[in-house]
Amino acid sequence: MISDDDDLPSTRPGSVNEELPETEPEDNDELPETEPESDSDKPTVTSNKTENQVADEDYDSFDDFVPSQTHTASKIPVKNKRAKKCTVESDSSSSDDSDQGDDCEFIPACDETQEVPKIKRGYTLRTRASVKNKCDDSWDDGIDEEDVSKRSEDTLNDSFVDPEFMDSVLDNQLTIKGKKQFLDDGEFFTDRNVPQIDEATKMKWASMTSPPQEALNALNEFFGHKGFREKQWDVVRNVLGGKDQFVLMSTGYGKSVCYQLPSLLLNSMTVVVSPLISLMNDQVTTLVSKGIDAVKLDGHSTQIEWDQVANNMHRIRFIYMSPEMVTSQKGLELLTSCRKHISLLAIDEAHCVSQWGHDFRNSYRHLAEIRNRSDLCNIPMIALTATATVRVRDDVIANLRLRKPLITTTSFDRKNLYISVHSSKDMAEDLGLFMKTDEVKGRHFGGPTIIYCQTKQMVDDVNCVLRRIGVRSAHYHAGLTKNQREKAHTDFMRDKITTIVATVAFGMGIDKPDVRNVIHYGCPNNIESYYQEIGRAGRDGSPSICRVFWAPKDLNTIKFKLRNSQQKEEVVENLTMMLRQLELVLTTVGCRRYQLLKHFDPSYAKPPTMQADCCDRCTEMLNGNQDSSSSIVDVTTESKWLFQVINEMYNGKTGIGKPIEFLRGSSKEDWRIKTTSQQKLFGIGKHIPDKWWKALAASLRIAGYLGEVRLMQMKFGSCITLSELGERWLLTGKEMKIDATPILLQGKKEKAAPSTVPGASRSQSTKSSTEIPTKILGANKIREYEPANENEQLMNLKKQEVTGLPEKIDQLRSRLDDIRVGIANMHEVAPFQIVSNTVLDCFANLRPTSASNLEMIDGMSAQQKSRYGKRFVDCVVQFSKETGIATNVNANDMIPPELISKMQKVLSDAVRRVYTEHLISRSTAKEVATARGISEGTVYSYLAMAVEKGLPLHLDKLNVSRKNIAMALNAVRVHLGSNVAVLTPWVEAMGVVPDFNQLKLIRAILIYEYGLDTSENQEKPDIQSMPSTSNPSTIKTVPSTPSSSLRAPPLKKFKL
């Protein structure tokens, strides 16, 4: 692991993710056959830019980026009084050189208007009280709204088309108070009037299974939430009880609340160990924006900053440190001096501790040294991660020396992520298929997008292609300058670019909740890396898409890296196993989500039916374009043929091509025949295509029946051999059933050739493509579905004017977003660090008009309400005057409390937002899709989920009538044997019918009313009586792939 004190090299030694040297392979197709080209031999993508243009526009990235202090002079008015009294001294190491990483603030000396460097800062130390004491011009927590709100509102509405004018207005507003709201580096902390909690009270809270009011108040004050998520309070109270813990929570679930709230409750300090400087920067900035005192200390921190932390430790709530820094002599001495204030040591991204994880870092192993010190050994320790198998968890616990740790886990399943896999062909064509265009953003993927690539060269190529076709993108890898990396990171965080193309090292360093797309252009390193990297998408709970474009040659590059990584043999073997598991996800014809999740939790139950908005395979099955019952294939006979040929003809070690040629009767291999049994095997598989045999071999390798070995003379390739599992199976002669791939299902003839292998039975390889999944509707109606216009609770509630309401809500949301962007630019932070997208959605839907009504806004901390609340409220008031839209909408006036409670229990966050918007505003699916920036098919799928739980919809707005429901019921009973699993034959059976999306709702209503027949002996429907689906022109598709939660037009139908 690289120390924070060191200059960052272009690679991380010993890591699987390190960049290949120029002599190693990147893009060659046949690694085993030929030595790959070097980077210098490859064609490069050129750009018609001058050298200066390239320097100005190109970006770079690295996971351990440290904000530099590039000084860009700009004229702003500065008061003499502040300049004289608020000067921060800098040590001798400070300079204008951007590579020095100096964190001190520059204050001008005397003139009223001077050249003032704008410092790009990684926030370190702040206070309000000390500045008030130093400066004659005191300031409060926010801009004086009495003085500037009216003027700012008018200017904000009129001047967003002119960014330079906007910047000057906001700078002038700040200098009215003489101090920016975000204080600069090198300053002290604010005093919070929080009473010290005695030990008895702390232990009382630790014993409470339900959170006390004090905890709920702190949660609302700092995080804006009115209640804890499941298991969050359990983790918090165990911290209060002084217990060690291992916490495994999926990305976006709220791990930070678990380790941040205890210090805020107890008025104590938490030391957070985090692997990446960029991640620490983002998290500290977010905490400060909420009025929480936090500091980051790393190898670039000055001695002044260390001294200021030591002198103000009673005020600091959080210290973020890298593992190298916290275990250094200087770091341990600081912990010792702060010991009486420290209540918790939090190890974030704890999977880095384990050598069996995908991102092992040796520096994390040294954290156990803290437990060796008598003065620090009693600090409670909590290890947190979103990615860990049982083996990794046990390794982390052992290496950190956690004492009888309490283990808390949540589901790995992130339902708002849609998984899709594609073959990579032409770069521009592959990526262009999923783009949209608008006047403001140009071409984009529907929201902030991260594209991961395996090599720096591929990053540069993808970025060049994107720019050429009009995408605002930047590249981010270790090969360029620190300034370029910093600019790319900052511009992406602040939405100045829509897409960032990066090497996989960038993944853990992103802390942006509204990433809508994660695209892998090239195969990920392994299944755990893939899960970690797609975890960057949709952390705000909104629908997001995860795509992989890959080719088999990508696997060769990864295997080459593994073989040459000089890691322990057992570690390489484990990483290779995880690569095989990923390959299964990429090639399966079944649910990709299921294949992904069962790696982390073998007990994860396979869903009984296809899941809406789950993955591309489920979408294909819902459309009727694929048979879900054929996710397992029987390849007993063919496997025996292949294994016998490998052992008898090639002495158990060979490339896969020669045994296949032998089985298919190639004249190249007939010279090997020496016995009668060998003659019988020669050409026995000639009726089966070559690509089918290769797919079978790949599947047997993934399943562990075939192994890979590298002979001494083989530099790049490897050969296959029967594994111990394969040898045992060959002796037993049992059935061989493996996970199907599209080629295994489609590429083989239905009738297998008669077997000539003793003891082998006729193959039942692929199931008939006419079989369809079964989901049998119950025979009798068990309850009646009530739409919204028949629901008594909804009919008796307060009505609101709905004419044009969805459009008005969307317009208001746009104005609110513009104000947020303006404030973010003023403070030089990302827009989501001002308030989240969810908060803006609440403002647009509930429309509060006073400070007291801000309590209805969930997710907005007390500090955010104080600083920014009036800006958004004023915008709502002005918009209401212009449009007449209703304000101060109480959710209980529109939706009964009982219904709200049910929604919260049975619907995910993303589904609940879509359902609530439809229910309150009586919107059509198209209106909801436009407002939320997702596809119309996604809206229908989400609403169908609500219907299956019995929640009411405005069916008249969705073009669903009782007549259509009756027609659909009759068709499924008469023609399909009550099988509602697949929509395509159902549509054909009905004739003139609603479209697929409306049929989704009808099916959900029928399932709610009749239930499903769960008997094991249910008869399958007669395939012969079903309408033919052989004509592709009659097969429709369901555009159910989610796109984005940004305000953009809904996606067109996807080609899957």
Swiss-Prot record:
Positions that bind ATP: M249, S250, T251, G252, Y253, G254, K255, S256
Biased composition (Acidic residues): 19-38, 54-63
Molecular function terms, GO-annotated: 3'-5' DNA helicase activity; ATP binding; ATP hydrolysis activity; DNA binding; four-way junction helicase activity; metal ion binding
Domain HRDC: 806-886
Domain Helicase C-terminal: 427-583
Catalytic activity: Couples ATP hydrolysis with the unwinding of duplex DNA by translocating in the 3'-5' direction; ATP + H2O = ADP + phosphate + H(+)
Region described as Disordered: spans on this chain: 1-102, 749-771, 1018-1056
Keyword annotations from UniProtKB, A to Z: ATP-binding, DNA-binding, Helicase, Hydrolase, Isomerase, Metal-binding, Nucleotide-binding, Nucleus, Repeat, Zinc
UniProt GO cellular component terms: chromosome; cytoplasm; nucleoplasm; nucleus; site of double-strand break
Domain Helicase ATP-binding: 236-406
Requisite cofactors: Zn(2+)
Location in or out of the cell: Nucleus
Location of the motif DEAH box: 348-351
Disulfide bonds: none
GO biological process, one term: telomere maintenance
Positions annotated to bind Zn(2+): C591, C614, C615, C618
Top enzyme category: isomerase
Sequence repeats: 17-26, 28-37
Pfam families named among the record's database cross-references: DEAD, Helicase_C, HRDC, HTH_40, RecQ_Zn_bind, RQC
Cited InterPro entries: DEAD/DEAH_box_helicase_dom (IPR011545), DNA_helicase_ATP-dep_RecQ (IPR004589), Helicase_ATP-bd (IPR014001), Helicase_C-like (IPR001650), Helicase_HTH (IPR029491), HRDC-like_sf (IPR010997), HRDC_dom (IPR002121), HRDC_dom_sf (IPR044876)
Cofactor, free-text remark: Binds a Zn(2+) ion per subunit.
Other comments on record: Unlike orthologs in vertebrates, this protein does not have an exonuclease domain.
Record family assignment: Belongs to the helicase family. RecQ subfamily.
Function: Essential for the formation of DNA replication focal centers; stably associates with foci elements generating binding sites for RP-A. Exhibits a magnesium-dependent ATP-dependent 3'-5' DNA-helicase activity. May be involved in the control of genomic stability.
The protein's name: ATP-dependent helicase wrn-1
